[in-house]
Amino acid sequence: MSFANADTPPQVVVLGAGAWGSSLAYVLNNNDIPTQVWSRRSPQSLESMVAGADVIVSAVSIKGVPSVAARLEAMDLQRRTILVTATKGLDPETMTTPSQIWQAALPSQPIAVLSGPNLSKEIDQGLPAATVVASSDQAAAEEIQTIFAADNFRVYTNNDPLGTELGGTLKNVMAIAVGVCEGLGLGTNAKSALITRALPEITRVGLHFGAQPDTFWGLAGLGDLLATCSSMLSRNYRVGYGLSKGQSLEEILANLGGTAEGVNTTDVLIKIANREKIAVPITRQVYRLLHGKITPPQAVEALMERELKAEFEDFDL
């Protein structure tokens, strides 16, 4: 079925009523797409709400993905129901991405990843933005592109869901580092250098697991990295900024008003990097900082005093 040519619009259910889930529902409703939002506090059950849905958009936190996926796995979903994951994070138990969790739970369903430089508050204000829908099922990607595209929300497609997902997930770690840099008042030169060196670190991880290099130069990679590392609207950026001002991690998280997925992602990424022997120098300093092993100035010093090397060493695309 093509949503664009159908007599009636598709029925969509957004899982997760946080800032991001609410923003995605806002875009869909503005496009006259019938959309319901489910959360753990919803009076209606998850099962009854998604029964008959054409599209399910998951915007629950990474912590909630496995349990929600297990509940949908037990259902008999329509074969062409498309599952779109918009969660950014890594599961601490399995060290897998949200789309990998969903694919394991729903092997017969088309799975798509939605990610890009999309700060939810700007989306809610109707400011222009662009995003990426990635899937190995091109038809599914194009269907999701159709329902989300709007005058102020441009949607691209690609066929690299893993790279799209990793770009959106790993930049949260880098945003913590950039928040530290900004909070310490290290200047534009330092901030630019840090963001630039963050991109090959993200790409290195992605390529190790088979992602496509071009993905990281696009909206889900460089685009999301720039947005998240340039705005106090980013919760991960604010974590780093708060640490640079002497606040404890516990204090920062308590006052954040939402989840900073970069904190959990840092821990999981270090485990993956250790297991796979992937160089992640920025992530290692963020990890040490989050666990109180070094101070913010010491983290900067450790990065600046690394062994000298060629710019594109161990970054062979």
Curated annotation (Swiss-Prot):
It is found in: Cytoplasm. Sn-glycerol 3-phosphate binds at residues 88, 116, 171, 224, 234-236. Keywords: Cytoplasm, Lipid biosynthesis, Lipid metabolism, NAD, NADP, Nucleotide-binding, Oxidoreductase, Phospholipid biosynthesis, Phospholipid metabolism. Catalyzes the reduction of the glycolytic intermediate dihydroxyacetone phosphate (DHAP) to sn-glycerol 3-phosphate (G3P), the key precursor for phospholipid synthesis. The keyword Glycosyltransferase does not apply. The gene is gpsA. GO terms for molecular function: glycerol-3-phosphate dehydrogenase [NAD(P)+] activity; NAD binding. Its EC number is 1.1.1.94. PANTHER family: GLYCEROL-3-PHOSPHATE DEHYDROGENASE (PTHR11728), GLYCEROL-3-PHOSPHATE DEHYDROGENASE [NAD(+)] 2, CHLOROPLASTIC (PTHR11728:SF1). Gene3D superfamilies: N-(1-d-carboxylethyl)-l-norvaline Dehydrogenase, domain 2, NAD(P)-binding Rossmann-like Domain. It is an enzyme of class 1 (oxidoreductase). GO terms for biological process: carbohydrate metabolic process; glycerol-3-phosphate biosynthetic process; glycerol-3-phosphate catabolic process; glycerol-3-phosphate metabolic process; glycerophospholipid metabolic process; phospholipid biosynthetic process. This is Glycerol-3-phosphate dehydrogenase [NAD(P)+]. The active site is at residue 171. It comes from the Bacteria. GO terms for cellular component: cytosol.
